């Protein structure tokens, strides 16, 4: 049983060492640990104990990563950019991707922000 505890401790260390990595990499490492456990000479009870330990730690990692990501703040568009967008909208209510990029450069915002602004403006205009 001491071997299982030390193995679980090593697994814990491994899982917490990969906190800075992407979720896909955490899943890959966790799956590798699961495969290693399944191929080992451990009893079913020991395997189950280790699986449970890994699952609990992976949940903690997910929650930790989720907490670290700050919510996206609402980006504001300057009054000058808004006025320019209004002018463009009066001329044309829908833009293709090249036009969105050009407008975005002139406004100092991203093409995605232009796209969302136009979608919202069309919805408000109905």
UniProtKB/Swiss-Prot annotation:
Q: Where are the transmembrane segments?
A: none
Which Pfam families does UniProt cross-reference here? Homeodomain (PF00046)
| CC terms in the record's Gene Ontology section | nucleus
Q: Which organism is it from?
A: Saccharomyces cerevisiae (Baker's yeast)
**Which family is this protein grouped under?**
Belongs to the MATA1 family.
Q: Which PANTHER family match?
A: HOMEOBOX-LEUCINE ZIPPER PROTEIN HAT14 (PTHR45714), HOMEOBOX-LEUCINE ZIPPER PROTEIN HAT9 (PTHR45714:SF34)
PROSITE patterns documented for this protein: HOMEOBOX_1, HOMEOBOX_2
Q: Which residue ranges hold the DNA-binding region?
A: 70-126
The molecular function terms in GO held by this entry are:
DNA binding; DNA-binding transcription factor activity, RNA polymerase II-specific; transcription corepressor activity
Task: From the Swiss-Prot or TrEMBL record, state where the protein is found.
Answer: Nucleus
Query: Which terms are listed as keywords in the entry?
Result: DNA-binding, Homeobox, Nucleus, Transcription, Transcription regulation
Protein name, as recorded: Mating-type protein A1
Which gene produces this protein? Answer: MATA1
Top-rank lineage group of the source organism: Eukaryota
Q: Name one GO biological process term.
A: regulation of mating-type specific transcription, DNA-templated
Miscellaneous note of the record = Was initially thought to be alternatively spliced.
């Amino acid at each position: 049983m001491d071997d299982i505890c030390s193995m679980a401790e090593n697994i814990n260390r491994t899982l917490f060492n990969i906190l800075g990595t992407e979720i896909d990499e955490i899943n890959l490492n966790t799956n590798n640990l699961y495969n290693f456990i399944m191929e080992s000479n451990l009893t079913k009870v020991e395997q189950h104990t280790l699986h449970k330990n890994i699952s609990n730690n992976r949940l903690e990692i997910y929650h930790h990563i989720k907490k670290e990501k700050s919510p996206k703040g609402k980006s504001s568009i300057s009054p000058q950019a808004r006025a320019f967008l209004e002018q463009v909208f009066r001329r044309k209510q829908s833009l293709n991707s090249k036009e969105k990029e050009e407008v975005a450069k002139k406004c100092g915002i991203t093409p995605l922000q232009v796209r969302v602004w136009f979608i919202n403006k069309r919805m408000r205009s109905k």
